[in-house]
Amino acid sequence: MIEFVKGTIDYVSPQYIVIENGGIGYQIFTPNPFIYKERSQETIFTYHHIREDAFSLYGFSTREEKALFTKLLNVTGIGPKGALAILGSGDPGAVIQAIENEDEAFLVKFPGVGKKTARQIILDLKGKLADVVPEMIENLFNHEERLEKQTAETALEEALEALRVLGYAEKEIKKVLPHLKEEIGLTTDQYVKKALQKLLK
């Protein structure tokens, strides 16, 4: 198995590149060939696809792209050309996010992906990409956690403002604030109700 090819880009076509290494030119199908420039030095991470009638190399600029490509090949109805089209048409992080969020509308935008195939991609890959592209998954979920935290902080701030409007002094509000901070994920109304329960005791 060829893990990667490091060499000089000899030729760029709409479907593939040719990279020269040790006097040998490797034809490699890539998602976006025109990101490469002829005579530039590149490292291409490769996947060797073997069929009875053909031996083909598919190449990617990162190991993460390659890993996502191999995962897509495991989906019923997705072949090398389909997986390559998905990677070529969208950012890998956006593809992963669409899978995790079950966003069929996003996935059907890719060439050759209908509703049935989009649903199959989600069924086969949701929750199974963390070990393949951990950095992308980590960034995705960290982003979601940050949004949740920001939403909770906003709800708490709105609740405190509501208490001020109701006429409660800062001293009283500060007394119940530690109790409110212990509560996670409440809405503004729920925070207000919790505060009033403490204040009216």
Curated annotation (Swiss-Prot):
One of its GO terms (cellular component) is Holliday junction helicase complex. CDD domains: UBA_RuvA_C (cd14332). Its main location: cytoplasm. GO terms for molecular function: ATP binding; four-way junction DNA binding; four-way junction helicase activity. Keywords: Cytoplasm, DNA damage, DNA recombination, DNA repair, DNA-binding. Residues 1-61 are annotated as: Domain I. The RuvA-RuvB-RuvC complex processes Holliday junction (HJ) DNA during genetic recombination and DNA repair, while the RuvA-RuvB complex plays an important role in the rescue of blocked DNA replication forks via replication fork reversal (RFR). RuvA specifically binds to HJ cruciform DNA, conferring on it an open structure. The RuvB hexamer acts as an ATP-dependent pump, pulling dsDNA into and through the RuvAB complex. HJ branch migration allows RuvC to scan DNA until it finds its consensus sequence, where it cleaves and resolves the cruciform DNA. Has three domains with a flexible linker between the domains II and III and assumes an 'L' shape. Domain III is highly mobile and contacts RuvB. This is Holliday junction branch migration complex subunit RuvA. It comes from Bacillus subtilis (strain 168).
